[in-house]
Regions:
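Flavin-dependent oxidoreductase catalytic cores
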Residues: 1-269
Length: 269
């Protein structure tokens, strides 16, 4: 199946990439068959579910799974992988002090909270070197709420990612279980967010969600000013996550126009 997809992409002269990651606490026992895992034990209201903090001895095997995912992606014909280390999924749950309350060497200081990410990147980069696969990392510029990762700390994480010689960092932001609108912006899609929830939770979200979920007003290119700070701090290629302008036609326009002269943008695709 996937080989057919990548084959068709290659036939048209393009390269194919796929995102790899683990959702951590953004799962549910009905989906994964067991209590979801995370950096620390707790409760995720978004799912909703109780989650189990991973044991120290489980972490190396989880990191190796990221490496195996690179091999599987290559076997399926993909030229690149994007390691998801943002948006409040598993690697992000280790990085963020909001979800990482560990007392061992994987929690506490930023250096400790980056330890699991480093383990995963080591496995990914070894697999990438063996298979000739390019590697991108999706990274949070900020979590979007008090008590989460802010830009200064995030830049330090990005510098650590850069040290692993990845091909580029995809800059994004937001934490799905706490500040989902930091990613999407604008009106909160309450009915869509609660569609698959149990009846009791659906009612709770629809009545209380607008008061509990932080709003982030929409503005065009809303990540751009923060992304510039990362451009100043890093040397590797950065991919800016954008959205259509209000006209809804920016992607068509830029694909047929030369990139604007800019000190931080090399090209638009």
């Amino acid at each position: 199946g996937l080989r057919e997809v990548t084959g068709a992409i290659h036939t048209e002269g393009a390269a194919a990439g796929i995102q790899i990651g683990h959702c951590g606490n953004m799962s549910h026992k009905k989906i994964c068959g067991t209590t979801p895992i995370s950096a620390s034990t707790g409760f995720n209201l978004y799912s909703p579910t109780f989650v189990r903090g991973m044991k120290k001895e489980e972490l190396p095997e989880m990191a190796r799974a990221y490496g195996r995912a690179v091999h599987l992606a290559r076997e399926a014909g993909f030229d690149a992988v994007e390691v998801h280390a943002g948006h409040g999924y598993l690697i992000s749950q280790f990085l963020s002090p909001y979800t990482n309350h560990r007392k061992d060497e994987y929690g506490g200081s930023l250096d400790n909270r980056m330890r699991f990410m480093r383990m995963c990147l080591e496995e990914v980069m070894n697999a990438a070197a063996a298979t000739g696969t390019s590697v991108l990392v999706k990274h949070n510029m900020y979590d979007g709420f008090k008590g989460g990762i802010e830009i200064p700390e995030s830049i330090e994480i990005a510098r650590e990612i850069e040290r692993w010689k990845v091909n580029g960092i995809v800059l994004s932001g937001g934490f799905v279980s706490k500040a989902p609108m930091a990613v999407m912006r604008g009106l909160i899609p309450i009915y869509t967010m609660s569609y698959y929830s149990p009846l009791w939770l659906r009612a709770f979200i629809r009545y209380c969600g607008p008061f509990m979920i932080r709003q982030f007003p929409f503005s065009e290119c809303y990540f751009l000013e923060d992304a510039k700070k990362f451009r100043e701090a890093l040397q590797l290629p950065l991919i800016y996550v954008g959205v259509p302008l209000k006209s809804g036609s920016i992607f068509f326009k830029v694909s047929h126009s030369p990139a604007p002269a800019s000190p931080f943008c090399e090209r638009l695709i």
